[in-house]
Amino acid sequence: MVFGQVVIGPPGSGKTTYCNGMSQFLSLMGRKVAIVNLDPANDALPYECGVNIEELIKLEDVMSEHSLGPNGGLVYCMEYLEKNIDWLESKLKPLLKDHYILFDFPGQVELFFIHDSTKNVLTKLIKSLNLRLTAVQLIDSHLCCDPGNYVSSLLLSLSTMLHMELPHVNVLSKIDLIGSYGKLAFNLDFYTDVQDLSYLEHHLSQDPRSAKYRKLTKELCSVIEDYSLVNFTTLDIQDKESVGDLVKLIDKSNGYIFAGIDASVVEYSKIAIGQTDWDYNRVAAVQEKYMEDEEIQD
């Protein structure tokens, strides 16, 4: 049984930086980590790859040969990977004995909530290699500063969760920079817990662009609340406590926390519940740490 993370998110959300930082953190914890780069457009990697899709196919070659743009080229690459899944399986098998796997995916979001190739690749790997994976979706925290962008990020997160069908952790990345993006309309816990979205209506009406689609946005918010699946944790990749809290969540979601444990059902339950870590207190501490200067200016 092999554990790992599927790192996804829009362009610029910090996926490659996350993989690099998470790899270093887990290595310090004593885990052997292998990063699998499945982004054929990422040719400036800050980490050493265990597997690199560029050995199979390159985006620039696809664009040149088939006269495709970047998005069409990435879709082609994922379809090509799906058809050549044996190549990826053969590359992963030597790592299965003792490695924790990080999959670094492209940032084109349509690959994760519309197109099926990425989902099919992961499904085949999970079945053939007995993988236990958690999808970690990174959302840049600056999107919280704009109500319309925040609702869009919620809709993206929900759509991806439903489409990928994996244990899922949504992350507001770059939380250390949130104080520089501008003042939030509400406390940070409003955005992490996805509280009553009707409170956003007033702020949406202040923006002429959002006001035009006010009714549509209201209906989308209703869909998000009806499913009640989306919430966020926060991440400062340079802060070991922040990364450690995220690792705990991921380990619970993919079952790593139970690996190698021979215990009764009662003991498993104790481990699963663990020591109570109140989200409100944790998020309040994050707000105080990273948004203190903004509050002083007020």
Curated annotation (Swiss-Prot):
UniProt xrefs under SUPFAM superfamilies: P-loop containing nucleoside triphosphate hydrolases (SSF52540)
Natural source organism: Arabidopsis thaliana (Mouse-ear cress)
GO biological process, alphabetically ordered: cell division; chloroplast organization; developmental process; embryo development ending in seed dormancy; shoot apical meristem development
Lineage: Eukaryota, Viridiplantae, Streptophyta, Embryophyta, Tracheophyta
Binding annotation for GTP: G12, S13, G14, K15, T16, T17, S173, K174, I175, D176
A single GO molecular function term of this UniProt record: hydrolase activity
rRNA-binding found in the keyword field: no
Entry-linked InterPro entries: Gpn, Gpn2, P-loop_NTPase
Keyword terms: Cytoplasm, Cytoskeleton, GTP-binding, Hydrolase, Nucleotide-binding, Nucleus
Annotated positions for site Stabilizes the phosphate intermediate: N71
Tissue: Expressed in vascular tissues, root tips, apical and root meristematic regions, and floral primordia.
Name the UniProt record assigns to this protein: GPN-loop GTPase QQT1
Record flagged with keyword DNA-binding: no
Protein function: Small GTPase that is essential for the correct formation of the tangential divisions in early embryos. Associates with microtubule during mitosis and may function in the positioning of the division plane. May participate in the patterning of the early embryo at the octant-dermatogen transition. Is crucial for normal development of the plant.
